[in-house]
A protein has these predicted regions:
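Acyl-donor binding region in acyl/amide transferases
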Residues: 1-138
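Non-catalytic substrate-recognition and accessory regions of acyl/acetyltransferase enzymes
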Residues: 1-9, 154-187
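Active-site proximal loops enriched in glycine and acidic residues that flank catalytic Cys/His/Asp
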Residues: 50, 145, 160-162
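Short, solvent-exposed polar/charged micro-motifs at secondary-structure junctions
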Residues: 57-59, 150-156
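Metal-dependent phosphoester-hydrolase catalytic domains
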Residues: 137-143, 157
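Short proline/glycine-enriched turn/loop segments at secondary-structure junctions
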Residues: 143-150
Length: 187
């Protein structure tokens, strides 16, 4: 895991006030991250936790963990959670295994969404956004942990390979800063 850390930045938790949620707030966060990445091309990975609220029913948390482990799990065991979240892989996702393409992901996601509807919750937006930011294989879920210092929520630790960010998103969030920094540097 150390070789990854040498070329990584950690993305900590973000909180957006409810009155600003849904109004491009996550988009603005991505622009900020992209500006930093533009200035630091030596960074190759984003690493950080994504939390599941403790207000969620535990069975829904287990389905989320199963889905993201089945389709996006890193099977090299780069990390060992201190307090592992206990869950089993569920059969609904078994046919999909590692995501091979967008269509495969869409089919699996439709199943996940239906299961979440049964629990009365929605798939957390950051889980969806990180996965959809990258080409298949570019976002890896390294493990699920219970975080006692954060209300015992369930955290997924993710590893994003920056070189797999989809072209449109790379242009929007990272390359869009080229003119800003060129103007600043020439002033």
């Amino acid at each position: 895991f150390i070789p990854y850390l040498e070329h990584s930045i950690e993305l900590g938790r973000s909180f957006i006030q409810p009155r600003y949620q849904g109004k491009r707030s996550l988009d603005y966060l991505w622009y900020g991250i992209g500006a930093y990445l533009y200035q630091h091309p030596e960074i190759r990975y984003l690493i950080g936790p994504i939390s599941l609220s403790t207000s969620w029913p535990e069975p829904a948390q287990k389905v989320i963990a199963s889905f993201y482990t089945t389709l996006f799990g890193n099977h090299k065991t780069l990390v060992d959670p201190r307090l592992p979240f206990d869950f089993e892989l569920i059969q609904e996702f078994a046919p999909f295994k590692q995501v091979a393409d967008e269509e495969n992901y869409k089919q699996a996601y439709a199943i996940l969404k239906a299961l979440m509807d049964d629990f009365g919750v929605k798939v957390p937006i950051l889980y969806k956004q990180y996965v959809e930011l990258c080409q298949p294989g570019g976002c890896e879920f390294l493990g699920f942990n219970i975080d006692p210092s954060f209300s015992n929520c369930v955290d997924a630790l993710i590893l994003v390979h920056i070189n797999t960010i989809k072209e449109k998103k790379h242009q929007r969030y990272i390359e869009s800063h080229a003119t800003v920094f060129q103007k600043r540097d020439s002033a």
